[in-house]
Structure formats: structure tokens, C-alpha cells
Amino acid sequence: YKRQPISEAAFSGLAVGAAMMGMRPVVEFMFWSFCYVAFDQIFNNAASIRYMSGGLINVPIVFRGPANGGTNVGATHSHTPENFAANTPGLKVICPSTPADAKGMLKSAIRDNDPVCVMENTILYNLRDEVPEEDDFTIPLGKSKVVREGNDLSIIAHGNAVHTSIPVSYTHLTLPTNTTV
């Protein structure tokens, strides 16, 4: 743990260099809205170094923080850039929807050899749910989770949207459907 000034570009660049040297830094953004001031370090450097080095250099880094859609925190604190990051080659994006997801996905992200962006919705910070106690509990990155089985319609959601999709899956106004969430 190193205290840094509030300069997303500086601490992101420092962490990318540390990751290239074998450390596994976790960078915390106060809000993901500020990732744009560290654009070059995240989207050009961290995401591309493995490819630019022909696979010789890994960048095992985690960028995490609140991506706050729907929280009424104002324009400069409410960006949800997960779609942008997910479409950047070399970056992985995770958006936990439960406390167990947060624990298991974060542990997997820290162990991953590529950059991972953890985008958390603060609406979920006070969510109470069971969390597995075993030390080796992880959730593999890149795998989806089905929270309701169905065979007529699928709702694909992430983060807090999982919780708002479940009641919607029981209400279809025109046809009776069996919905997967």
C-alpha cells in the first residue's frame, strides 16, 4: 500500500510499471468517471503491452472503483464506462452483483495476468448476502451466472441491473414467458 496524490494518470502509470516488473497492483479510482484522465495508461499501455511485447510482458493489474449509474451523484461521478472498457482489446471487465461475486471475482482479477477493470455500483455496497468463507473461493472471469432459469426469453444483465431484472422477468405484459436472467 502506497499513498499517492489524487492524480489518476500518475498512480495508474506507476501501477502499470509496477505490474510490468512483476507486482500485482490494485488501483482504486474514487469514481470510474476519472478513468479518462488516465486513458493512456489504462487503455493504451496496460491493455496493449502484452501484444506490443509479443506476449513477453504481462500486466497483472486491477483497476477498481464505483461505476455509478442510477445513484444521483452528479455528472462527474456517474459515468459507467464498462461498455467502453469491455470493447478495448486486452482489458477484462467485471461487474459484481452480489457480495460473493465481489469476493470471488476480485480474487480472480488479482490472480489474472492481464489488466482487469472492476466496476462496482455503490447501490450494492450495502447489500447483505452470504459470502463463502473458504480462502480459495474464486469465481472464474468470463463466465456468466444464471440467477433464474427459463426457456422463452433471456435477460442479460450485470451489476445492479441483475437485481432490477429479476422482478421484470416475472412480468411480461403480452405473453406468458419463462424468462432466464
Positions of PLM-derived features:
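Conserved thiamine diphosphate
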Residues: S7-A10, V16-I156, N160-T164
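Conserved small/polar residues in nucleotide/adenosyl-binding loops
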Residues: Y1-Q4, T171-T177
